[in-house]
A protein has these predicted regions:
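Generic detector of solvent-exposed, compositionally biased contiguous segments
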Residues: 43-69, 126, 132
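ADP-ribose/NAD+-binding catalytic cleft of ART/PARP-like enzymes
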Residues: 1-40, 47, 53-59
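Short, charged/polar surface micro-motifs in flexible loops or helix N-caps
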Residues: 19, 45-48, 89-92
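A structural detector for beta-sheet-dominated domains
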Residues: 28, 85-87, 123, 131
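Conserved small/polar residues in nucleotide/adenosyl-binding loops
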Residues: 153-157
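Surface-exposed flexible segments
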Residues: 20-37, 91-117
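SIR2/sirtuin-family catalytic core signature
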Residues: 112-121, 125-147
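Charge-dense polyanion-binding interfaces
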Residues: 59-102
Length: 157
């Protein structure tokens, strides 16, 4: 398991970030890697919202940070986040996915969720440059329509 090389994705990419990072991202014209070897993206707005529902929207849930330390997600504050719709500029770097590593006896439901999670995010090894004027979605606007959001993030009861 672990990293697997993939083909360069075609078309638009999406990246969620805290608003406090937006000014420097727009000024630099790139998404910079953060304490990791990769920068992470999704193929659609729906994938972005689903990824967020499995990560930053999980207040109190445990996760391992880029340095391998166990952390807990803080309270999710929608006003603090935006999603960028990016048109990547030519890059010659390597694209990867990270396949979640599980013990052999993991339940099928855990395996299915790990498979979904692994394929929601696309990693780029390096800083990804993008063309000017990306579309910026306010998280509060995306979450305003509960029924639409539920269908976008594939929550099943």
């Amino acid at each position: 398991m672990g990293y697997e090389r993939i083909q360069k994705p075609e078309g638009l990419l999406y990246h969620y970030t805290r608003k406090e990072n937006l000014e420097s991202i727009l000024r630099d014209g790139r998404i910079r890697k953060f304490c990791d070897r990769e920068t992470w993206f999704t193929k659609s707005l729906a994938d972005t919202l689903r990824l967020m529902s499995l990560t930053v929207m999980q207040e109190g849930a445990a996760y391992y940070d880029a340095r391998g330390r166990l952390q807990r997600y803080p309270a999710f504050v929608p006003e603090d986040y935006v999603v960028l719709e990016l048109t990547p500029r030519y890059q010659s770097g390597e694209w990867v996915i990270w396949n979640q590593e599980l013990p052999p006896n993991a339940p099928e439901s855990v395996r299915e969720l790990a498979e979904e999670f692994s394929h929601l995010k696309l990693g780029y090894r390096g800083d990804l440059k993008f063309w000017e004027n990306p579309v910026i979605y306010e998280m509060t606007d995306l979450l305003e329509e509960p029924e639409q959001t539920l269908s976008l993030i594939h929550i099943s009861e």
